[in-house]
Swiss-Prot record:
Name of this chain's protein: Hemin transport protein HmuS
Keywords, ordered alphabetically: Ion transport, Iron, Iron transport, Transport
Function: Part of the binding-protein-dependent transport system for hemin.
Transmembrane segments: none
CDD domains found in the cross-reference section: HemS-like_C, HemS-like_N
Species of provenance: Yersinia pestis
Amino acid sequence: MNASLYQQYVQAKAEHPGKYARDLATLMGISEAELTHSRVGHDAKRLQSDARALLAALESVGEVKAITRNTYAVHEQVGRYENQHLNGHAGLILNPRALDLRLFLNQWASAFTLTEETRHGVRHSIQFFDHQGDALHKVYVTEQTDMSAWEALLAQFIIPENPALQLEPLSTPEAVEPTADDATVDSEWRAMTDVHQFFQLLKRNNLTRQQAFRAVGDDLAYQVDNNSLTQLLHIAQQDQNEIMIFVGNRGCVQIFTGLIEKVTPHNEWINVFNQRFTLHLIETAIAESWITRKPTKDGFVTSLELFAADGTQLAQLYGQRTEGQPEQNQWREQIARLINKDIAA
């Protein structure tokens, strides 16, 4: 099976030389993990699936490029796997303004290392996949990576066999009616003292994020035009205040904090090119753009949240804020410049 899959991959790659493995897998009707599994013995090797141990070992290799993506957005950050807190099912790699990750490790299922020949030379990577076979997180060598430490890590974690992937269909919970009326949701939202309490509010009331947004008053959540992301990135680039950009998937959220250096649209993509950070996001996939205001003990925190038609959250943007400090007035003024969407239209 793997041999024929690999041959299909080689053929698909020859027919579509510019496409990434994720897109080739989609063309082939398989997951990216299945595609990578078929490459073992060619340009891939299987690694032990202990994500915590692998992530901990990555601290030794120094600088790398970390990539976290979903279907519509790709977040690339150069940094180091330092300041790790990987206890329990959730983990943190906490380096604000550098490599800043939130990890949901019960979603991490398999790992591979790849050595790929590309038109830009050889690329070395470690790639992590979830139980559905989707890529959660990828780690690429840079010119500054300690290659002797990288090779030592691989020697420790490569396994000679390539066990079958135990893929599971994504369990989509049946549609459940919200358990609270709009007034209750609004009241509970206003009572929050920490943005992380929002997840508890959603769970308690069987709500999606967008259902909660629609339930509360316009002073807490309202829709804006879907070109708001591009507008806000250009404003932040012009004003040179620090912002935060969150992009995530089921198992990993990657966070950028800093100044925006260059914003470049290209076809359907909006791109941010910084020296150590890159964002690629399919602007045409944005179906809803929401401004939300969540109360904390330090005052309200305002964000722009972007959703695709299938409900996927593409990205979230905040003004840079340190715990214990109020939100930037400049960020609030920038948000206020975005155009309200007339929902009734």
